Structures are given as structure tokens and as C-alpha cells.
Regions:
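Long, charged, low-complexity intrinsically disordered regions
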Residues: 1-81
Length: 81
């Protein structure tokens, strides 16, 4: 399934810009999408990472948040695959 994982790079965005971009991607995610991988980076601080984890924990479209081995990436799991 080519569309099963969507990626969104929010490097350099403000928290407001990043939230707007993430919300738009979540709205457009089709039924074949089970994961939104957000690339936020970590060398410039944790503001974006912290915002993602705070704002999307408990979001109606997000089943859970996964933190991988790469500290600059957070996955929003939309459904189980």
C-alpha cells in the first residue's frame, strides 16, 4: 500500500505553522493511511516535539503516539495495520 505512511517535515516551522500543517495532513489522510510520520528534528530544541506529543495525545484521529529510535521523528498512529 503506497499511501500507508505519510511523512511531514516541519523543520523550521513555528509551533502554530506546524500544528496547522499537521491538522491539514490529518484531515486529508485517506483510509489507507495508518501512520503519520512527523519529522521535527531535535538539534534546535524540543518545542515542536513537545507540542506534537501534547496536542495529539488524545486527539480523535490518533490512536497513539510512537517515539522511535530517531529523536527527531514522532509517529502518530491513526489505525492498526
Amino acid at each position: 500500500m503506497p499511501e500507508s505512511i505519510l511523512e511531514l517535515d516541519i523543520h523550521g516551522m513555528t509551533r502554530v505553522q506546524a500544528k496547522t500543517a499537521i491538522d491539514a495532513k490529518l484531515r486529508r489522510a485517506g483510509s489507507g493511511v495508518y501512520r503519520l510520520r512527523i519529522i521535527h528534528g531535535y538539534h534546535s530544541g524540543t518545542a515542536l516535539r513537545d507540542m506534537i506529543r501534547r496536542e495529539y495525545t488524545g486527539h480523535p484521529k490518533v490512536k497513539r503516539i510512537e517515539i522511535g529510535l530517531n529523536m527527531g521523528v514522532t509517529d502518530l498512529v491513526l489505525r492498526e495495520y
